[in-house]
From Swiss-Prot:
It comes from Solanum tuberosum (Potato). Residues 1-22 form the signal peptide. One of its GO terms (cellular component) is vacuole. Inhibitor of trypsin (serine protease). May protect the plant by inhibiting proteases of invading organisms. The lineage of its organism: Eukaryota, Viridiplantae, Streptophyta, Embryophyta, Tracheophyta. This is Probable serine protease inhibitor 6.
Length: 221
């Protein structure tokens, strides 16, 4: 499994941009770029925070939240979970940092982006707010989502939002070496689905082959 990820990483070209690339030379959005919408039909705004909520209710529902990973020696909470029901607390707010967000534009489907928990935290825990995919967990047979990623870097922190085949949206993990090589692409050949596995009685976000998590986005008031 790990070898597959390394192979995927090697298949993406590394593009080196000129140092003259600045805000005066912004990314040109494709003409067919489709903005991601929240539950009210408004376009996602990279300046705002959102709850990632399930498109289902009751026991099938539950918001995404930041929590302590079992058996983790990290100094801060670094696990990404989903509540076991939509009855209870709201999830941890997130913000989306897309390839175009630095230029005041929105968040779009199939756009490579970073996800960051939008919470106040200590200086020690600042780096434990950015989503990434962790190492392979042999006991669960997959790779778990956690925090500790980096924004805008060629590592394990790149995701996409795509239309679900059922309701709402799906999250994809895309192991890309450079976001600038292809910031917008509908070719998800090398992306993997984000779903849920059960870990110590909790629903943990992880990479899955089937049954991806269907989500919607609700603006934090």
């Amino acid at each position: 499994m790990k070898c597959l990820f390394l192979l995927c990483l090697c298949l993406f070209p590394i593009v080196v941009f000129s140092s003259t690339f600045t805000s005066q030379n912004p990314i040109n959005l494709p003409s067919d770029a489709t903005p991601v919408l929240d539950v009210t039909g408004k376009e996602l705004d990279p300046r705002l925070s959102y709850h990632i909520i399930s498109t289902f209710w009751g026991a099938l529902g539950g918001d995404v939240y930041l929590g302590k990973s079992p058996n983790s020696d990290a100094p801060c909470a670094n696990g990404i979970f989903r509540y076991n029901s939509d009855v209870g607390p709201s999830g941890t707010p997130v913000r989306f940092i897309g390839s175009s967000s630095h230029f005041g534009q929105g968040i779009f489907e199939n756009e490579l982006l970073n996800i960051q928990f939008a919470i106040s935290t200590s200086k020690l825990c600042v780096s434990y707010t950015i989503w990434k995919v962790g190492d392979y967990d042999a006991s669960l047979g997959t790779m778990l989502l956690e925090t500790g990623g980096t924004i805008g870097q060629a590592d394990s922190s790149w995701f996409k939002i795509v239309q679900s085949s059922q309701f709402g949206y799906n999250l994809l993990y895309c192991p890309v070496t450079s976001t600038m090589s292809c910031p917008f692409s509908s070719d998800d050949q090398f992306c993997l689905k984000v779903g849920v596995v059960h870990q110590n009685g909790k629903r943990r976000l992880a990479l899955v082959k089937d049954n991806p998590l269907d989500v919607s986005f609700k603006q934090v008031q």
